[in-house]
């Protein structure tokens, strides 16, 4: 049986690698590249769900000014995009009803095509 010290040391070791990566300023893992068919579907979903009314994204011919522009947004990463699409943030409503697969596709699309 492992002592409390051993369990604590094991837990600390498990956190060390991710924390070291964070402290070193490493970038989050890149979103996987979409096929042309997936890009087309992502673009269509972006437009059909009204994302283009608030956000700027050249690939989707979107010039909204209410929400942040995705073009040239170096801080936009897939994980954050999934979180905001799912739960909403500020004036943006939640789109959690879309389901995980569709949310993942939209987030990956936006991150992949931003200029």
Task: Place the predicted regions along the sequence by residue.
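C-terminal capping alpha-helices of c-type cytochrome domains
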Residues: 97-115
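Gly/Gly-Pro-rich "capping" loops immediately C-terminal to redox-active cysteine motifs
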Residues: 39-43, 47, 53-87, 97
């Amino acid at each position: 049986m492992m002592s409390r010290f051993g369990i604590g040391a094991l837990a600390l070791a498990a956190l060390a690698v991710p924390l070291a990566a964070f402290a070193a300023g490493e970038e989050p893992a890149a979103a996987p590249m979409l096929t042309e068919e997936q890009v087309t579907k992502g673009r269509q979903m972006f437009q059909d769900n009204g994302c283009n009314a608030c956000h700027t994204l050249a690939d989707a011919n979107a010039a909204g000014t209410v929400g942040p522009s995705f073009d040239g947004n170096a801080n936009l990463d897939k994980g954050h995009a999934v979180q905001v699409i799912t739960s909403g943030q500020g004036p943006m409503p939640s789109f959690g009803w879309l389901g995980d697969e569709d949310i993942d596709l939209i987030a990956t699309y936006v991150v992949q095509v931003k200029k």
